[in-house]
Amino acid sequence: MLWEIQLYFSTFDGVINTLMIYKEPIKARRLLQKDGYYFDLCYPQDKRVSNTQAVLWLEKLCKEFNADIVITSTWRKDYELACECLYNSGLSKTIRVIDKTPWLDGYRGAEIDAWLKEHPCPAFVILDDDTDMEPYIDHLVKTDFDTGITVMIYERAKQLLQNQLSK
């Protein structure tokens, strides 16, 4: 099957799960308090991610391009829980999380390559805070670990997809 568009993001951490800081404790969240501030960074067992703004930017991108999500994060060890974390963090149920990449020795680019050989698609973006994406470095929109997906990342990903679709 040829997928119309795939949207990959390789890590939850540094993409949609970033270190969030608050002045006041946030209700129903496990926070680390230090120096008068409250810090939030989630783990899979929290059943959510910390940066709900980044989740909304991801959702907007998916809706705009009718894109699906393939998880390449280490959180994919428990795929169902990883999906639950996304939806619990505000991702609309209309956005499909369709699969995860295989576990291979080496780097993420090889895992994405293995997945693409089984599921070819003409246009995709990799959202990641790392750069081990060969042979798909041209599809990478690199995020900053501390901020994840922002409006600037969204705009870069949008432009990259538009460029791929116009060829």
Predicted feature descriptions by range:
Residues 17, 22, 75-76, 114-115:
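Tryptophan-centric aromatic hotspots in well-structured domains and transmembrane helices
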Residues 1-64:
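Active-site neighborhood of HAD-like aspartate-dependent phosphohydrolases
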Residues 50, 74-78, 104:
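Generic, well-ordered alpha-helical segments
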Residues 80-167:
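C-terminal cap/substrate-recognition subdomain and adjoining C-terminal extension
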Residues 48, 72, 143:
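Short, charged/polar micro-motifs that form catalytic or ligand-binding hotspots
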Residues 7, 68-69, 123-125:
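Structural motif
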Residues 62-83:
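Substrate-recognition element of Asp-dependent hydrolases with the DxDx(T/V) motif
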Residues 10, 72-75, 127-129:
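Short His-Asn-centered micro-motif
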